[in-house]
């Protein structure tokens, strides 16, 4: 029995074809909006945008969906953390400083924690459906520890050059 939100395609509410069309339209709109950022960040953003779009599709579609083969956490870390934060900063500043890279890693770790909580909840159903998440591979105890370590690491990364922030880690 599923405790999370209803899965539209799996439940038959939406056909796979309709979901694909909706996903491609949404991705197309996102790409069109993203192309306007080339005016601010330069043409280097075009190949970055293509890579982002390809990984958006590869995350849950195609012959080898990353989210079903234990690569969801890494993908979320890279694209919701490093790329999202660093490209945003680059577009505005024209460069990316070390502290931005560290901060983006922290954001990526916190994003992975959100995915871990979701996969923790869905562990049994994912295992039955052969969706191999890191929680399915390594278990709930590993997920608990990962959530803790990711949270502490995110605070440490944010406080790298501001040691007083690390005081928040003291219980």
Per-region residue spans from a language model:
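Acidic (Asp/Glu-rich) catalytic motifs at the cytosolic membrane interface
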Residues: 1-3, 113-135
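Small-residue-rich segments of transmembrane alpha-helices in multi-pass membrane proteins
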Residues: 74-89, 107, 135-143, 152
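Terminal transmembrane helical module of multi-pass membrane proteins
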Residues: 98-100, 107, 116, 120
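Alpha-helical transmembrane segments
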Residues: 101-112, 162-168
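Conserved small/polar residues in nucleotide/adenosyl-binding loops
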Residues: 171
């Amino acid at each position: 029995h599923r405790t999370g939100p209803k899965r539209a395609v799996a439940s038959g509410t939406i056909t796979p074809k309709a979901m694909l069309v909706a996903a491609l339209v949404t991705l197309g709109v996102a790409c069109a909006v993203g192309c306007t950022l080339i005016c601010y960040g330069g043409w280097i953003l075009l190949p970055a945008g293509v890579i982002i779009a390809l990984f958006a599709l590869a995350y849950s579609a195609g012959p080898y969906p990353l989210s079903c083969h234990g690569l969801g956490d890494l993908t979320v870390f890279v694209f919701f953390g490093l790329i999202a934060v660093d490209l945003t900063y680059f577009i505005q500043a024209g460069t990316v400083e070390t502290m931005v890279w560290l901060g983006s890693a922290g954001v990526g770790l916190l994003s992975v924690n959100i995915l871990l909580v979701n996969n923790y909840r869905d562990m049994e159903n994912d295992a039955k459906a052969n969706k191999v998440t890191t929680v399915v591979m390594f278990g709930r105890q590993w997920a608990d520890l990962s959530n803790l370590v990711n949270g502490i690491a995110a605070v440490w990364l944010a406080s790298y050059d501001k040691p007083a922030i690390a005081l928040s880690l003291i219980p």
